[in-house]
């Protein structure tokens, strides 16, 4: 799903990023006027998602050279992102921000949330 040239509504999500001193927040202000890829996945500690995250991680430098930031997004907490990053060899390669959409704001905005 493409949201090129669309305005993103205000949001503020907690984030984990390997190498950052602490958790931090990412908002629409951080992505305004910049190329960004939001990669949504269902949940941390699943069997399929690490493969896709590892693939994005292996191409991360290419995206950065093009001026594109990658954000992975799930409804798990930023603490869970950190724990998964520490536990999984594949997810441990991720250097881009892992956003916690635990209130479903961004997932609903991008229309990727599947209600249970």
Predicted segments with their positions:
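Chalcogenol-based redox active-site neighborhoods
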Residues: 1-116
């Amino acid at each position: 799903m493409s949201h090129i040239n669309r305005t993103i509504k205000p949001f503020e999500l907690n984030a984990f990023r390997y190498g950052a001193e602490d958790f931090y927040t990412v908002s629409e202000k951080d992505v305004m006027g910049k190329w960004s890829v939001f990669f949504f996945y269902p949940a941390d500690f699943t069997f399929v998602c690490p493969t896709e995250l590892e693939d994005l991680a292996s191409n991360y430098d290419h995206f950065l050279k093009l001026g594109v930031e990658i954000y992975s997004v799930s409804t798990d907490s930023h603490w869970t992102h950190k724990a998964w990053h520490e536990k999984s060899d594949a997810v441990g390669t991720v250097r881009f921000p892992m956003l916690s959409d635990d209130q479903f704001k961004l997932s609903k905005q991008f229309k990727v949330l599947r209600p249970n």
